[in-house]
């Protein structure tokens, strides 16, 4: 993978953030930040400049699909993958239209998360 890729994890669930962090960390990624909502995500993105963002869809405040749009406005090259418990076609389409590269449905297998991360960075 070369130089370790920096990741920002965005999810309102501490358990989910911890699980994603554990999987990515043991596979060579460096988790540089975690956010519980969209506002924190946008603030941290500007400061941390991560290579990859994992984004939940349903969180307090703005939906993840709107946050993706904001991140892409800040950085047209922002690489975002959605990790969500919702597998609704309209949300998948909206996330992709707003700039997400991959959509992983919870619960997920470790391999699925890692494959999506690699494709998003691709």
What label would you give each PLM region?
Residues 14-33:
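Two-component/phosphorelay signaling modules centered on CheY-like receiver
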Residues 10-11, 35, 53:
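Conserved sequence signature across two-component system core domains
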Residues 60-61, 88:
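The feature encodes the CheY-like receiver
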Residues 48-54:
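Active-site beta3 strand of CheY-like receiver
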Residues 37-40, 63-66:
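Acidic catalytic/metal-coordinating carboxylates
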Residues 90, 108-117:
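C-terminal output helix
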């Amino acid at each position: 993978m070369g130089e370790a890729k920096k990741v920002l994890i965005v999810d309102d669930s501490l358990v989910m953030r911890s699980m994603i962090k554990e999987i990515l960390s043991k596979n060579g990624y460096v988790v540089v930040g975690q956010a519980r909502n969209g506002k924190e995500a946008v603030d941290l993105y500007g400061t941390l400049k991560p290579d990859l963002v994992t984004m939940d869809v349903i969180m307090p405040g703005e939906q993840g699909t709107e946050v993706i749009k904001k991140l892409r406005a800040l950085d047209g090259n922002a690489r975002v993958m959605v990790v969500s418990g919702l597998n609704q076609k309209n949300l998948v389409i909206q996330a992709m239209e707003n700039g997400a590269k991959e959509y992983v449905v919870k619960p997920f297998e470790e391999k699925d998360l890692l494959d999506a991360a690699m494709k998003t960075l691709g």
